[in-house]
């Protein structure tokens, strides 16, 4: 383009000169205005404008061809949207960042959380997107892809590290066999173990369902050591941690709730009722025969009473009373009064141990349990499963309820019937009595102390202060009543408590015992072990340190002294005869045992002379005169022989 700035304007005198001057002035004015506008807009940039090309060169954006980065470029003025484009462009270019991060494979569930809550929180707080690989490929770590700005990626890493550190295995925590499974053990106070387990295992079952884990309370043994019990939790690491917090929260809540207690030391809480501790050996007294006592208390007080299940390691069982608060308090007072009344009994007096089963009473008076006793009995092999139960559940339940230890003897005695199984119950007399009652309910009949069932038996083992009691109308008594012992004849009713003996009460008590109606003769059986039983009694009385009270020399004679009817049924087939074994046993101990007395053929044997001889020998013994020979004792019912073997097991 030609440069007209050096061309002089045409003269005013020339043709069209006036018009040329007007155009030149207008151009100058326009150029001046353009420079002013450029100066206002571009500041110093306006200096880059020149007059050549009519000043259009100034319309070009400054620094367009500069080598500076985009951030240094000046956005056009009056363009708010355009002014924001460089920072957004910069952010977009920097957000395209993906980094791989490794996390422990066992912690993936803990990082994700229930329903993805945990990982959603991490993404929201950090602004970083997290993608976890579906599996680890057998490696101990799993890959996570973090996408975001460097700051958001670092924030996500920090949050992931915190979660992994929080869920890192604590003492007792280790990974399970399955993929992603972990096992953690927490210690539960012994007093709170029942709270965590709940009635019938309901509480621990609910905890397992809510947390989605498996919980097992580890019990080393039945002994109550007072030590904390480990609770093993197995499952996903995050769920295991949640389950642990739920258990600790349960213990804290219940512990605070139990701060409100009544006069019995038990918590009170509206519909929760009252918890009354009952000595384990006294549970049978509160329940009563066939539950009669506890039913009476419930009816009188208008409440419901249930014994909470436990592991059998505590000295007390908890009776839970539910109902209106005032009635619960009344029922608790009834139970407490019942226990106090029994504990306040006269020492040496008759106790409630008979239960109307033909058993003699001991001198326990509901006090603290004394020394442990042992009771052996046999049951048919076909009924063994009823006592043991599936997986031993029944026998464990009976042991927990009664507090006694029940065992099936794997090594039966010699010459034992292979069709019978021998069980042993160990515990206090009260525990044994309660366990025996529960076992009889399971098998639907009375247990047999080391022998087949018989309709009659003795009251119990004679104590050092009196001769043996005559056979009573109930089932055989187990040899677990501790001395001092005061056996006596049964009351007028089959379930009445036995009457105590006075030192001179044999003469008066014996006729009263004669008035008992004879049992069904068809149920009686001959006993081949009578000689062994007679030898046992003679030897037993010679070992007593304190002689029994004197008895009349001439006691009334009767043909029913053995508690049997007029007819004697033949001995059952296959009956094992232990007479020779017992004779050999006493021979070794220096005791001569005569042959069993013969019985007249046919009909009921007459033992009047034998009983008269027995009392004469007793009178001679009480007078400090040793008998010259062993009295001929009458054959005893089968229960006597079994009783002797059971008592021999104790001593």
UniProtKB/Swiss-Prot annotation:
Residues 514-528, 552-574 have a biased composition (Low complexity). The modification N-acetylalanine is found at residue 2. Found in a complex with PUF60 and far upstream element (FUSE) DNA segment. Interacts with PUF60 and JTV1. The modification Phosphoserine is found at residues 48, 51, 136, 411, 626. Residues 61-73 have a biased composition (Basic and acidic residues). GO terms for biological process: hematopoietic stem cell proliferation; regulation of transcription by RNA polymerase II; somatic stem cell division. This is Far upstream element-binding protein 1. Residues 464-501 have a biased composition (Pro residues). GO terms for molecular function: RNA binding; RNA polymerase II cis-regulatory region sequence-specific DNA binding. The keyword Glycoprotein does not apply. The lineage of its organism: Eukaryota, Metazoa, Chordata, Craniata, Vertebrata.
